[in-house]
Amino acid sequence: MKKNKKIVVPIIIIILLIATGAVIYLTTFKNSNQLNIKEKEWIDKNKTSIVTVNLPNDLNVFSTDGKGTINEFFDELSKEYGISINKNVSDYKTNTSLGLTVSESKPEEGLLLFTDHYVLISKNRELINEPSDLNGKKIGGLNEGIAYISKGYKITSTFVTYESDTALAQGLEDKAIDYALVPLNEYIDKILEKNYIITYHLPELKKYYYIHLGTDEILNSIVNKFYNIWYNDEYEKSYYTNLYNLFVEKLALTGLDTDKLTSKTYKIGFTENPAYTSLSGNKTGGILFSYLTDFSKFVNT
């Protein structure tokens, strides 16, 4: 009996320490993101002013037709602080004011939301294990994507540069190219609608989605503090909900279809492969289980 008591007491102490640490962390995190006097005064002075934010209207999960994750961020910001916001439709590739910007280089300033990557898509179901499998193939893309892959990969493919997304999509439809090189999030709607096959991921070719701050330093500080809280509490739910809704729309799924998808308990079997799975004690890991974890979040939105 004494032995059991000796075991229980340390466990209780550990639990209390963890709980105390969590409370301290959350309290410190919350306090560090509370508005200071200057920020509160700025809000009071600008109650009748309108803050313009530049947002795209064609960026799938993040911003389409006034909906999406970045729209929800600014809607919640407006509701939290009573700031009137005007959403101005803008090109996400060239935006330099307060709003959403997408760039090939990781921003030194700004508030990072999401990191996208390039993929190769095809009309045919083909297995590509490594870049050398692309030798002799025709790969189409826009200037930025082709510049990346032609310099970063030692492959003897034919690269075809297109001036627009429309022309690139038509080239794939006409079989003028074997593969189209595209950023995954930007093209996920077309991939779903056309039933294109993602044949290869290029995770090192990235695009960064971030909130570009404006010229008003106090407003920037308000946005930054709200972002810290919102990203921690709301971002993941917003992202997966919007992604799920996009899949439902583009795949024309019915209510019955979605009920079948979300009501199941999925049992996944696997064989150990160090490249894709890992097993330590009773815990699983690796690339495969990372995908499965994301899928679980996706269907349980």
Question: What residue ranges belong to the model's regions?
Answer:
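N-terminal hydrophobic or amphipathic helices and topogenic motifs
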Residues: M1-N88, K106-E109, L113-T115, L127-S132, ...
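Structural recognition of the beta-strand scaffold that forms the well-ordered cores
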Residues: V53, G99-T101, G141, A180-V182, ...
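Flexible loop residues that form catalytic
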Residues: D58, V102-E104, E144, L184-N185, ...
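A ligand-binding cleft/hinge motif common to bilobed small-molecule-binding domains
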Residues: Y92-P107, Q170-L205
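Flexible hinge/capping segments at coil-to-helix
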Residues: S122-I139
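Secondary-structure junction motif
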Residues: I139-K154
